[in-house]
């Protein structure tokens, strides 16, 4: 079932009971299939909303990340036109506030777009959590640092940053297992008729119905409406965690991501982060559009000093 805003806003089920929480669920009732491509600027721009959904309503859903191959599936024609991709990235960054530096397509263009997708499946062989962390590190290196993430040395750096087992990752990178897993994702993309990325398909695991498909980027309220429609109740959002806990969990986050999660203006977010920077809790990572912030892990610093 495709997303229809009129249908969603017509739902009148409510549930304001404080008892309506994750404790009632042995299994989370909703599964979200998130179709992405590591080279897609809009997929990167979806990150603030995924984080906010996870913070407020993560007790209701699990995320299954699917590599769609929309950009990576050997689409040679597109990758012979770096100026076109540069323009897309620049427009996306200005529109969404999530920095993606299109200069990479002039300075260090991606040679083999298929490889990063294969690397994600290799990382996922170490677990779903490892796979998600690896995707994030790919995106940070690509969109912020302008690294060519089709190069093996950059992939190994990403694997290190994601705390993967490097020997296992190297062994799996071009393995038949990783290739088979990627083919399964591409097949699922076709079967679900996903022709645009990012796309999220929401499924209620307790009801045999078609999923609700949302293709593209929408305001956060739309994703909340979908959850309400599928749950047939109005879920109560969880409280946002203390900012330092949020930063410690995600390690590297953008000003835009923090502002979305905490419902702050960009100016207020900058002021709060500068306070933490002054306290040496975070360090600023300058970007072409806005800033990112890296949590300073004191325990690692102390361990290194003791060695």
Curated annotation (Swiss-Prot):
Cytoplasm in keyword set: yes
Which organism was this protein described from? Oceanobacillus iheyensis (strain DSM 14371 / CIP 107618 / JCM 11309 / KCTC 3954 / HTE831)
Sequence similarity = Belongs to the SpxH family.
| Listed name of the protein | ClpXP adapter protein SpxH
InterPro entries in the record: Adapter_SpxH, Thioredoxin-like_sf
Q: Where primarily located?
A: cytoplasm
- Name its cellular compartments: Cytoplasm
Subunit composition and interactions:
Interacts with Spx.
């Amino acid at each position: 079932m495709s997303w229809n805003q009129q249908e969603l806003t017509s739902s009148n089920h409510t549930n304001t009971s404080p008892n309506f929480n994750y404790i009632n669920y042995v299994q989370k009732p909703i599964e979200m299939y998130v179709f992405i491509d590591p080279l897609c600027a809009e997929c990167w721009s979806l990150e603030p909303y995924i984080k906010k959904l996870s913070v407020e309503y993560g007790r209701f859903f699990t995320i299954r990340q699917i590599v769609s191959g929309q950009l990576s599936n050997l689409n040679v024609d597109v990758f012979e036109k770096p100026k076109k991709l540069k323009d897309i990235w620049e427009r996306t960054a200005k529109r969404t506030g999530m920095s993606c530096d299109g200069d990479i397509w002039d300075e260090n263009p991606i040679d083999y777009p298929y490889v990063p997708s294969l690397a994600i499946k290799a990382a996922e062989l170490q677990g779903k959590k490892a796979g998600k962390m690896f995707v994030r590190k790919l995106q940070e290196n690509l969109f912020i640092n302008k690294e060519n993430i089709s190069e093996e040395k950059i992939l190994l750096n990403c694997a290190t940053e994601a705390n993967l087992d490097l020997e296992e990752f190297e062994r799996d990178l071009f393995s038949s297992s990783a290739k088979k897993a990627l083919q399964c994702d591409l097949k699922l993309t076709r079967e679900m008729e996903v022709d645009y990325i990012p796309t999220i398909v929401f499924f209620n695991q307790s009801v045999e119905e078609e999923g609700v498909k949302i293709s593209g980027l929408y305001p956060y309220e739309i994703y909340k409406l979908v959850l309400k429609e599928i749950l047939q109740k109005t879920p109560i959002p969880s409280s946002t965690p203390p900012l330092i806990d949020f930063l410690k969990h995600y390690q590297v986050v953008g000003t835009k991501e923090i502002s979305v999660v905490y419902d702050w203006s960009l100016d207020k977010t900058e002021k709060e982060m500068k306070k933490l920077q002054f306290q040496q809790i975070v360090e600023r990572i300058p970007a072409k559009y806005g800033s990112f912030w890296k949590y300073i892990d004191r325990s690692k610093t102390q361990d290194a000093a003791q060695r």
